[in-house]
């Protein structure tokens, strides 16, 4: 968890955007729409819920941090987390979500390693 904190100090956008970009690409919507201040069509809402879930569980972000990143309140973030957890009851979706979490965690680790290499030079 400490590594996620150090990244937020050095390059907040490098890590924060991983969940949104991944969820948007998988669902097929523009990533910029995930933080739009208005309600969106169901496809965008589902992508946002997935992004919130990935940001929270794959990157270890707090509910408050997720709320700030996606321009939502904490209750909405908790609702998104619950909806995706329910969707994970479907084995196919669960497999997909697990792979997305692993991919985002791997990207985070790669970015952290590059930061560490740069700091060592």
Q: Can you describe what each PLM-predicted range is?
A:
Residues 45-60:
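Short, amphipathic alpha-helical "recognition" segments used to contact nucleic acids or chromatin
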Residues 1-21, 113-121:
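General nucleic-acid-binding
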Residues 25-48:
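Short, Lys/Arg-enriched anionic-surface-contact patches
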Residues 23, 64-70:
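Short alpha-helical "recognition helix" segments of helix-turn-helix
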Residues 56, 80-81, 88:
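DNA major-groove recognition helix of helix-turn-helix
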Residues 76-78:
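Helix-turn-helix DNA-binding helix
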Residues 88-107:
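Short Lys/Arg-enriched helix C-cap and helix-to-coil transition segments
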């Amino acid at each position: 968890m400490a590594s996620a904190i150090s990244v937020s100090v050095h390059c907040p956008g490098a890590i924060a955007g991983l969940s949104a970009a991944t969820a948007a690409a998988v669902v097929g919507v523009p990533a910029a729409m995930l933080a739009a201040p208005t309600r969106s069509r169901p496809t965008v809402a589902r992508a946002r819920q997935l992004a919130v879930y990935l940001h929270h569980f794959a990157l270890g972000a707090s509910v408050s941090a997720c709320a700030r990143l996606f321009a939502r309140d904490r209750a909405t973030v908790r609702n998104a987390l619950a909806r995706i957890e329910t969707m994970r009851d479907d084995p196919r979706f669960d497999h997909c979500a697990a792979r997305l979490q692993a991919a985002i965690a791997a990207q985070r680790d790669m970015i952290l390693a590059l930061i560490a290499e740069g700091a060592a030079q």
